[in-house]
């Protein structure tokens, strides 16, 4: 048989039963080894080849061992980003439904003129807001007297370094500390006590009362930190040792050079509750940054007010009769309905205070350390959350309450319990006094 006839017969022997001619090329599993049509073929032949390879019913789709995406297998790493996006969409849709339902049921409840801003509240609130910082000046006078006494002790020790003189100076130092500590405590109690008394009995608007009480608490924290820190600075100056070594950052302003009104004034306005003679500073003020943060704060403050007036207030009013008759099912429904609104208000308030306002203040004061919070949203425990969401208060409690208690022999659990109790009392003061609703009273 001639070679041409033999080739034709072999070609027809592998026919697929269609009119598409077989392509004379090297194949692997019925396909060209390179996955493309053979070279040297025309356009019609290429189209026929692609059509035949596309509709092959013998393709091996199950060619390796695989697991389901949600299986708990060691080599399976599934991404749940789509579920997160779905939850965001559902959350937005549910809140839009609540907004529509609220407007259909109540209409527009926002009323600027309906707020009861009494003249007495405005006058007393303004007076308290202006006079409370005066207690910082009193603490400055106390520390100035203690610093003067410390300089005298250092001068006498340089003249006479005998043991008897050292013991006498140590007694003087301890007496000075106890006297200054007494006046600092009295000053702090007056700052917080007078403000709390006036707000509880004479200021009826909770917003004005909260601002006054918050400033009194901040000033009280700053007075305590100012007193404790300068006490240790005096100790380090009078008794220099390895144990009393100071941080290197303090070298540019040694004690008692830090006892000035300018130094205390900076601490008063700085966004921190922990006193240091020196803070890390930024090189310049970015006024555009300040404007953006203040704009964010203003917008979020208005947003919180709108949510409170339009959504939170009606739910609370409608809950009074349910609580009176102890309708448990209705109470639970109101609590869950209010929880969404409360969460949004809390998140907006957190961003407005810790991100917008404190960053704007830090920029104006050129305050460098702006870690006012960390990623509390990733907290795996309640303790981690407390340490993350409000860093200024956490650092104050750790430096002036927790660490001294542990240093005096308290167990970490007992010290943490003391910090928790003190924090709970102060939160009750901040919330209960302006709203005239102290627990147990």
Predicted regions and their residues:
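Noncatalytic N-terminal accessory/assembly modules of large enzymes
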Residues: 1-148
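Intramembrane catalytic core of multi-pass membrane enzymes that act on lipidic substrates
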Residues: 5, 12, 29, 34, ...
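Membrane-proximal N-terminal segments immediately preceding the first transmembrane helix
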Residues: 34, 42, 51-75, 98-114, ...
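A broad "ordered helical/assembly scaffold" signature
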Residues: 48-50, 198, 202, 218-220, ...
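Hydrophobic alpha-helical cores of multi-pass transmembrane domains in eukaryotic membrane proteins
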Residues: 87-99, 126-141, 182-196, 212-224, ...
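Membrane-lumen (extracellular) interface motif
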Residues: 96-125, 144-151, 173-179, 195-211, ...
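Membrane-interfacial catalytic/cofactor-binding modules of polytopic membrane enzymes
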Residues: 249-296, 318-435
């Amino acid at each position: 048989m001639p070679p041409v006839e033999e080739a034709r017969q072999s070609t027809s022997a592998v026919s697929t039963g269609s009119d598409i001619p077989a392509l004379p090329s090297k194949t692997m599993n019925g396909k060209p080894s390179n996955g493309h049509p053979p070279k040297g073929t025309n356009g019609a032949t290429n189209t026929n080849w692609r059509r035949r390879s596309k509709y092959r019913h013998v393709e091996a789709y199950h060619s390796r061992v695989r697991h389901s995406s949600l299986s708990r297998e060691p080599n399976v790493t599934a991404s749940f980003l789509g579920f997160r996006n779905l939850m965001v969409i559902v959350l937005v849709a549910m809140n839009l439904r609540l907004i529509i339902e609220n407007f259909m049921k109540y209409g527009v409840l926002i009323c600027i003129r309906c707020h009861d801003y009494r003249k007495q509240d405005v006058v007393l609130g303004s007076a308290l807001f202006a006079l409370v910082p005066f207690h910082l000046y009193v603490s400055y006078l106390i520390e100035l007297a203690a610093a003067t006494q410390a300089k005298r002790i250092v001068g006498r020790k340089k003249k006479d370094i005998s043991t008897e003189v050292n013991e006498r100076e140590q007694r003087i130092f301890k007496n000075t500390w106890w006297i200054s500590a007494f006046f600092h405590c009295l000053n702090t109690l007056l700052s917080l006590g007078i403000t709390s008394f006036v707000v509880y009995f004479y200021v009826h608007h909770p917003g004005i009362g909260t601002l006054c009480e918050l400033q009194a608490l901040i000033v009280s924290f700053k007075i305590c930190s100012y007193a404790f820190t300068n006490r240790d600075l005096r100790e380090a100056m009078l008794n220099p040792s390895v144990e009393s070594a100071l941080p290197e950052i303090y070298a540019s302003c040694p004690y008692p050079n830090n006892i000035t009104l300018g130094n205390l004034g900076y601490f008063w306005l700085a966004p921190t509750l922990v006193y240091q003679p020196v803070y890390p500073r930024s090189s310049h003020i970015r006024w555009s940054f300040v404007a953006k943060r203040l704009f964010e704060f203003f917008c979020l403050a208005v947003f919180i007010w709108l949510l409170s007036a339009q959504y939170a207030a009606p739910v609370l009013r409608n809950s009074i009769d349910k609580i009176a008759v102890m309708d448990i099912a209705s109470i639970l429904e109101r609590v869950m309905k209010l929880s969404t609104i409360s969460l949004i208000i809390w998140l907006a308030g957190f961003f407005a205070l810790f991100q917008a306002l404190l960053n704007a203040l830090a920029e104006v004061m050129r305050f460098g350390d702006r870690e006012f919070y960390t990623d509390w949203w990733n907290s795996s425990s309640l303790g981690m959350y407390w340490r993350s969401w409000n860093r200024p208060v956490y650092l104050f409690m750790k430096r002036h309450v927790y660490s001294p208690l542990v240093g005096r022999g308290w167990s970490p659990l007992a010290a943490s319990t003391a910090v928790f109790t003190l924090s709970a009392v102060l939160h009750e003061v901040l919330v209960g006094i302006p709203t005239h609703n102290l627990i147990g009273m």
